[in-house]
Regions:
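Conserved beta-sheet core of the metallophosphoesterase superfamily
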Residues: 184-262
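N-terminal active-site segment of His-dependent metallophosphoesterases
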Residues: 1-68, 72-76, 178, 393, ...
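Conserved catalytic scaffold of divalent metal-dependent phosphoesterases
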Residues: 100-201
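Active-site neighborhood of divalent metal-dependent phosphoester/pyrophosphate hydrolases
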Residues: 40-58, 74-90, 183-203
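Divalent metal-coordination and catalytic microenvironments
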Residues: 8, 28, 48, 63, ...
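Active-site neighborhood of phospho(di)ester-bond hydrolases with catalytic His/Asp-centered motifs
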Residues: 6-7, 43-47, 78-85, 105-110, ...
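Metal-dependent catalytic neighborhoods of phosphoester/phosphodiester hydrolases
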Residues: 16, 49-66, 83-102, 108, ...
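Accessory, non-catalytic peripheral segments of nucleic-acid enzymes
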Residues: 260-400
Length: 400
């Protein structure tokens, strides 16, 4: 059985007012080619199909057209989709009666039975080969409060749900695949990336121990960097098909191919080249004169759909009312698309001066800020655990 793992498409994303439709179409065409070329049996999409809970009509057309075309071209292909935190779980599930006829299964809502217990069977999807069940998929969507068994905290509740699901199928003697849209302990996010910082103070980090060692592969979504989790080869984030922010400019794009056979589980990454990249100049914020020199080094040419998006970081050491005009003039004739000018003010530190923008300040977690203030106020003393736990609960309740 051959499986492809992808996630975090964010269809409909607007990148600093630039429409990314052509970039997403480029990825979906490539994905269809990989499915044909490698004769894929199962496609796993681990959440955040859309960039918003209320996607545009065009984004939905793109999504459903892809599902129709790829299942028509590959009649035996089975597709499993889970909702992410950016998706509307109910909206994603709504077309299930139609999608099931195309061999597409969507899981967004965690159902409960008449007794109030979680309907575990709804989250267990059989995988077929030539009409016979040859594996099981634990299709767990993004979990909100109340979506998991009662436990002391979010992490324990999520772990308990995966344990219950695995216990339902482990005696059947068939390979088990798990899916999830979450932040796993030991995973890495892109530096200064606001798009991924949805977990406050580690409160919703899930231990990789939630995924039993006997599970053949765990397909995760939510974090945008392709990676293994805690050095476990078979617990992975596929990453996004293209950078979703400038902080992700160095992330590798692609999907993960998993081959399950009698010999075991084989894992291979299939690299994808996005239609357009993103770039930041200079590497660190510099005064205007140096910024203009860096712009002069950019390649000349016409702006096309393959032209990279450009972020310019300028250090404002003194008032410069016309800096935007000067930058825009310098960019004329350059084969780039200006997306953002980040004007940064110098901030003094013991080690010198660093630049801080408003966007960078937004990446600081409230808990980290409080811990730092406490430490400086009380002569380097760490905040007591009881106070830290109380603060964590207040932050989580406030939802900031």
């Amino acid at each position: 059985m051959k499986i492809l793992h992808t996630a975090d498409w964010h269809l409909g994303q607007t990148f600093y007012e630039y429409d990314r439709r052509e970039e997403h179409l480029h990825f979906l065409e490539w994905l269809k080619q990989q499915i044909r070329q490698h004769e894929i049996d199962v496609l796993l999409i681990a959440g955040d199909v859309f960039a918003s809970p209320n996607p545009s009509a065009e984004s939905q057309r793109m999504y459903y057209r892809f599902l129709r075309e790829v299942t028509s071209e590959n009649p035996s292909l089975q597709i499993i989709i889970i909702a992410g935190n950016h998706d509307s779980a109910a909206r994603l599930e709504a077309p299930n009666p139609l999608l099931e006829d195309m061999n597409v299964t969507v899981r967004g809502v965690v159902r409960r039975n008449a007794e109030g217990d979680i309907d575990l069977q709804h989250l267990i999807v059989p995988l077929y080969t030539e009409g016979e069940v040859t594996a099981y998929c634990l299709a767990v969507p993004y979990l909100r409060q109340g979506d998991y068994p009662s436990a002391e905290n979010y992490s324990k509740g999520v772990q308990l749900l995966y344990e219950q699901l695995f216990n339902e199928v482990k005696e059947k003697g068939l390979p088990v695949i798990a899916m999830g849209h979450l932040q796993a302990t030991g995973s890495e996010i892109s530096e200064d990336d606001r798009s991924e910082r949805t977990v406050i103070g580690g409160l919703e980090c899930v231990s990789p121990d939630a995924f039993d060692e006997a599970i053949a592969y765990t397909a995760l979504g939510h974090l945008h960097r392709s990676q293994r989790v805690s050095h476990r080869e078979n617990v992975r984030y596929s990453g996004t098909p293209m950078p979703m922010s400038f902080a992700e400019r160095n992330n590798a794009s692609g999907v993960v191919m998993i081959t399950i056979s009698a010999e075991g589980t084989g894992i291979e990454r299939l690299a994808f080249e996005p239609l357009a990249g993103v770039m930041s100049i200079p590497r660190q914020a510099r005064p205007l004169e140096e910024v203009l020199q860096a712009i002069g080094d950019l390649p000349d040419g016409d702006v096309t759909l393959r032209s990279p998006y450009l972020e310019i970081k300028i250090l404002m050491t003194e008032p410069e009312p016309s800096y935007k005009y000067k930058i825009e003039e310098a960019l004329k004739g350059k084969a780039v698309r200006l997306a953002r000018i980040a004007a940064m003010l110098p901030q003094k530190k013991a080690s010198g001066i660093v630049a801080t923008s408003y966007e960078e300040l937004q990446t600081i977690r409230p808990l980290d800020m409080a811990l730092d203030v406490f430490k400086r106020k009380y002569g380097g003393t760490e905040m007591p655990d009881t106070m830290k736990q109380l603060l964590e609960s207040v932050i989580k309740e406030a939802g900031v």
